[in-house]
């Protein structure tokens, strides 16, 4: 009997599950000590509110992870300011007005779509998982109301596999849906007989295990455009349902799972290093230090006591102001502490602070909280900017991987979905069939470009200083190129800079106006001179009289 699709996928899932097992103990430990409610290794954990932070005494690691996620959100994909822009591969075409306006319009529509969707609620969770577990995953799906709908996956709930290029192209996700959700999403005819019986009996909120697999559709028929022959196959099925029944079999034009990794070792599928993994040892040590400090204080304030045997089974009190009566016996000290504890916690507190600093450094807290932790009022603005840029450069490699594995696929898929729904204006004719590229202009992306920005500003200032002594030095500066380069590296809107062809037209018009004004001024000067001559009295001993006499003298000589 031929193997069914569900049986084949279950076999592939078993292989992915076996491959992931070596990562799970590390992830569980990270979850226990840093992010207790950020994992889901069992589908039965859904809607469970049991306490999970029993191993955390000092929450420095948890707060550092929160700072990293918030800092990456505000520094990379902040909804409060533009963080990406579209461009053409040819830089000269970016100076063409219609192209510049079309790209700006498309970018604005994409930003509006992102703001309307739940993308900015999902990204902080993705960044948090990425920083603590070195791997994150988020689905970007089509939605009838918001165009796109994102769904972040908790660590432990998904299984990944790489393509030959080393990028993730396969994802299996095991999760739970209620009977009501299954019927609403897939229809009563597509669910198993067990779910049908639950529905008919009114058991709507019982949880059912579901598997969703997305993988390359290698055997697709490229001549067909139906959902089953798209580049990526999507299959939903019940884990415990019938072997020959699927909930839904469809496909995607683009891989819908964004799965960035903080750092990858060789051919590994999952991330191998991240701030959470670096900080795990200090986080565990910090819990022990805090426990010892509390024990030290507890022994000093509530010490163990020794007493004579005569007090056995007698009333003894340790309450403030209370009295315990004993008979003083020679050679005995009476009711007293077993040993005296000197609660000198200075060294312990210093060790705790040092451990906290290590944790914060691992999570780049000093980078994101730099302006708060440093007194910048007494520092020049240039020094503050330079210090901030230097700190942000530390995240350069992480940003490049995040762009490649998350943000680029996110923008490509969102753009393609808008094209399929005819939500974009028609492009100019010169852009027909031209690919687009994405440039990032977030705070952190601009920090990577700030070195070139500072160099450009320094060069222009240097030429300006030379021009004060030698004005011809300005001939060496291409002002138009300097303005375009500065605006490009600053990330300002393209509509702020006037296209080059409009600049040339304005300059020609200005030159023509100046030429006309000069000709008019010369004509007015000539007319004014003629008028002055015509109004002058020749009888006066003036220049005209002298001229008349000279003319008459010449006439007499000629006669």
How would you describe each model-predicted region?
Residues 14, 142-320:
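Structured, contiguous alpha/beta core segments that scaffold functional sites
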Residues 1-206:
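Extended, helix-rich architectural segments
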Residues 113-122, 209-221, 465-469:
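Charged, amphipathic alpha-helical segments
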Residues 1-34, 39-43, 302-559:
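C-terminal anchoring/interaction modules
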Residues 98, 102, 106, 118, ...:
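Short amphipathic alpha-helical segments
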Residues 60-76, 110, 114, 121-131, ...:
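Short, Φ-rich (hydrophobic/aromatic) sequence segments
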Residues 103, 107, 120-123, 135, ...:
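Alpha-helix initiation and N-capping motif
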């Amino acid at each position: 009997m031929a193997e069914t699709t569900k049986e084949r996928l279950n076999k592939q899932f078993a292989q992915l599950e076996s491959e992931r097992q070596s990562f799970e103990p590390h992830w569980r430990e990270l979850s226990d000590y840093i992010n207790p409610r950020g994992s889901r290794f069992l589908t039965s954990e859904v809607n469970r509110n049991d306490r999970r932070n029993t191993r955390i005494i000092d929450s420095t690691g948890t707060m550092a992870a929160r700072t990293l996620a918030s800092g990456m959100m505000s520094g990379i994909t902040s909804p409060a300011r533009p963080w990406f822009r579209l461009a053409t591969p040819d830089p000269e075409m970016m100076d063409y007005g219609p192209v510049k306006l079309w790209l700006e319009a498309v970018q604005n529509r994409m930003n509006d779509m992102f703001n309307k969707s739940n993308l900015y609620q999902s990204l902080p969770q993705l960044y948090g998982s990425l920083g603590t577990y070195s791997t994150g995953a988020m689905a970007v799906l089509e939605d009838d109301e918001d165009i796109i709908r994102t769904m972040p996956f908790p660590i432990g709930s998904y299984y990944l596999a790489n393509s030959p290029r080393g990028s993730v192209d396969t994802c299996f996700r095991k999760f739970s849906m209620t009977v009501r959700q299954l019927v609403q999403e897939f229809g009563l005819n597509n669910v198993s007989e067990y779910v049908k019986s639950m529905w008919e009996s009114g058991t709507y909120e019982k949880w059912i295990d579901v598997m969703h697999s997305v993988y390359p559709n290698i055997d697709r028929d490229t001549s067909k455009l139906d959902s089953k022959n798209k580049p990526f196959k999507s299959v939903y099925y019940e884990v415990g349902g019938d072997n020959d029944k699927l909930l839904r079999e469809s496909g995607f034009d683009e891989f819908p799972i964004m799965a960035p990794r903080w750092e990858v070792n060789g051919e590994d599928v999952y991330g191998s290093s991240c701030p959470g993994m670096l900080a795990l040892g200090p986080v565990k040590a910090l819990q022990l230090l805090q426990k010892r400090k509390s024990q030290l204080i507890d022994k000093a304030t509530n010490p163990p006591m020794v007493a004579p045997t005569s007090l056995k089974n007698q009333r003894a009190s340790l309450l403030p102001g209370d009295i315990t009566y004993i008979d003083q016996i020679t050679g005995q000290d009476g009711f007293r502490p077993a040993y005296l504890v000197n609660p000198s916690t200075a060294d312990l507190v210093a060790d705790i602070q040092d451990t906290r600093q290590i944790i914060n450094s691992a999570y780049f807290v000093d980078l994101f909280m730099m302006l708060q932790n440093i007194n910048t009022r007494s520092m020049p603005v240039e020094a503050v900017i330079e210090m901030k840029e230097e700190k942000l450069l530390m995240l350069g490699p992480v940003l490049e991987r995040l762009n490649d594995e998350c943000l680029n696929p996110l923008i490509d898929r969102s753009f393609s979905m808008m094209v399929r729904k005819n939500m974009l204006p028609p492009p100019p004719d010169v852009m027909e069939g031209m690919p687009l590229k994405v440039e990032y202009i977030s705070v952190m992306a601009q920090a990577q470009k700030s070195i070139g920005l500072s160099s450009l500003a320094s060069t222009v200032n240097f030429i300006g200083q030379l021009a004060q002594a030698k004005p011809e030095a300005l001939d060496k500066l291409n002002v138009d190129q300097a303005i375009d380069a500065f605006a490009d590296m600053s990330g300002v809107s393209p509509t702020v800079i006037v296209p080059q062809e409009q600049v040339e037209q304005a300059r020609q018009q200005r030159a023509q106006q100046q030429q006309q004004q000069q000709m008019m001024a010369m004509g007015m000067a000539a007319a004014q001179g003629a008028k002055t001559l015509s109004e002058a009295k020749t009888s006066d001993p003036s220049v005209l009289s002298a001229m008349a006499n000279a003319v008459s003298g010449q006439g007499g000589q000629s006669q």
